[in-house]
A protein has these predicted regions:
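Short hydrophobic alpha-helical segments enriched in small aliphatic residues
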Residues: 5-7, 13
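Short hydrophobic targeting helices and cationic amphipathic motifs
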Residues: 9-10, 20
Length: 507
């Protein structure tokens, strides 16, 4: 059937100047609470094991959540492996030889600095307490700027205001002092002064409200288990804390079988596990999560140029989703991981502030060199153009799928107030990522309209994720599609049966 679709853009298609006034302005905390509630109510994310009262920081993705998540992964995978001829994929095992994690440094160095409040008996990451304190100072600065911008309007010079306003300068000096000391303590693993910094900043426990803190100590984040038939003969293995090492140990396998020449990349999507003590903010920080990582192997001496190149490429990829430049920023690292000589984060404006969604790192040749040392195998690359062997340097791009999911949901969530005063939720997801691409709805459940709607579904379901809906009024059905982010709805009416034309609407 050749169906002609005439498209009428609804007033809810875009957030333009005519309907911005109808958007309900909410505090960011309220937005986040409503978003979490919406995710559960409409089948995006559920607490795991909920009938058993759940399991901390573990979540399940519902029928629409899994579709959105799969679309995010496909969007990333295709951009890596289809748009770049020199990037290929791999799927390595979660369980790997335990010596891999010794070589990578995870056994000895994959730790978080923890501190307990003696009154509440609650445990916190010391670095997170300080970072939250810094964020509060930054928020004070931003409030001063926003207040001045409102007062002076178009004549407001933000840069000059930040350089001259006494209150802003006072807050900024305090921020700089704390941040410099914090960075030094973390770099030097000076946990005694890290605790003293928490005391000097008068940081209190959110539960007890007291400053009765223990000493700071290290806690390894890897989950371990045993592999083998008996306790005596079992081997201690780990649930991988990252997907990158599976790429590194397969470097030569992929390079030789794929006849790859440096520079080239290996991409992977997979689950990782970290025993986070302070897991929080819904799916932003979980103990079981999914990563999208690409390791790009380059000739030594070229790594910083490639780092800059991938840094720019990855930001463009994020901005292509259309949420606006003001939602993104770079955060260059003061403290570098033991394997890196350059690192930056792409941060996204979440309801709880700017947070990392992707990390780009120049990992040097640390990982390949370590695996060569611990395995005793030669993992060097022979360059046929220069007739030399060397250990490639690596540029890494790493995204948390769950964080990406949360960033997209938070940027897409809109609450509108209609002329009647009634409130409605519209999830303005990018069409390429929407769980359901097309909803087909007969105007009534008789006179051949349902059959015609089913015929349209049958013609389109192999190309798009479609949904048929005949329950309730046509207005309520449109609202349901708005709430799950469906970009296009087709209404089959009496005219459709006669001339094969349908009315379509951008939800």
């Amino acid at each position: 059937m050749a169906t002609y679709i005439s498209v009428f853009y609804s007033k809810f298609a875009l957030l333009d100047k005519t309907n911005l006034a109808n958007i309900k302005i909410m505090a960011q905390e309220d937005v986040f609470k409503k978003l979490v509630s919406h995710c559960k109510e409409y089948g995006f994310v559920f607490p795991s094991s909920e009938i058993y009262d759940g399991l901390g920081a573990v979540y399940d993705y519902g029928q629409y959540g899994v579709e959105l998540k799969n679309n995010i992964k496909k969007y990333w995978w295709d951009s890596m492996t289809l748009l770049h001829e020199n990037v290929v994929g791999i799927d390595s095992a979660i369980f790997m030889h335990p010596t891999i994690w010794k070589a990578s440094g995870h056994v000895d160095a994959f730790n978080d600095p923890l501190i307990d409040n003696k009154d509440s008996k609650k445990r916190y990451r010391a670095d997170v307490l300080i970072e939250d304190h810094l964020a509060k100072i930054e928020e004070k600065i931003n409030k001063e700027v926003a207040k001045a911008a409102k007062k002076f309007g178009d004549a407001f010079d933000e840069a000059k205001f930040r350089e001259t306003n006494p209150r802003v300068l006072e807050h900024q000096a305090k921020w700089n002092e704390i941040h410099a000391r914090y960075s030094k303590d973390m770099n030097d693993s000076n946990f005694e002064d890290l605790r003293q910094l928490i005391l000097d900043c008068e940081i209190v426990c959110p539960i007890s409200g007291t400053r009765n803190w223990t000493d700071v100590r290290q806690f390894n984040l890897m989950f371990s288990t045993e592999m083998g038939s008996t306790a005596d003969g079992a081997m201690k293995v780990y649930l991988r804390p990252e997907t990158a090492q599976g790429i590194f140990v397969n470097f030569l396998n992929v390079q030789k079988t794929g006849r790859m020449k440096v520079p080239f990349g290996i991409a992977q999507i997979g689950k990782a596990f970290r025993n986070e003590i302070v897991a929080r903010q819904f799916i932003f920080r979980m103990r079981e999560f999914e990563q999208m990582e690409m390791q790009f192997f380059v000739k030594p001496g070229t790594e910083l140029d490639w780092f800059k190149s991938w840094k720019a490429t990855r930001l463009k990829w994020h901005k292509a989703l259309g949420f606006g430049d003001d939602h993104y920023r770079y955060h260059d690292h003061d403290k570098l991981a033991h394997y890196a000589n350059a690192a930056t984060d792409i941060e996204f404006l979440m309801p709880f502030g700017f947070k990392e969604v992707e990390g780009i790192h120049s990992r040097t040749n640390f990982d390949l060199s370590q695996h060569e040392k611990f395995s005793g195998k030669n993992i060097k690359y022979f360059d046929p153009e220069t007739n030399e062997s060397y250990t490639p340097y690596v540029i890494e791009t790493s995204i948390g799928v769950d964080r990406m999911f949360l960033s997209i949901m938070s940027a897409s969530y809109c609450e509108e107030t209609l002329d009647s005063g009634e409130s409605r939720v519209v999830l303005k997801l990018p069409a390429a990522l929407a769980p359901v691409k097309l909803a087909v709805m007969p105007l009534v459940k008789k006179d051949g309209l349902p059959e015609k709607a089913r015929e349209i579904i049958d013609n389109l379901k192999f190309h798009f994720h479609c949904q048929y809906d005949e329950k309730d009024s046509i207005g309520k059905r449109y609202r349901r599609q708005d709430e799950i982010g469906t970009p296009l709805c087709i209404t089959v009416d009496f005219q459709t049966v006669g001339d094969d034309k349908v009315e379509a609407d951008n939800c």
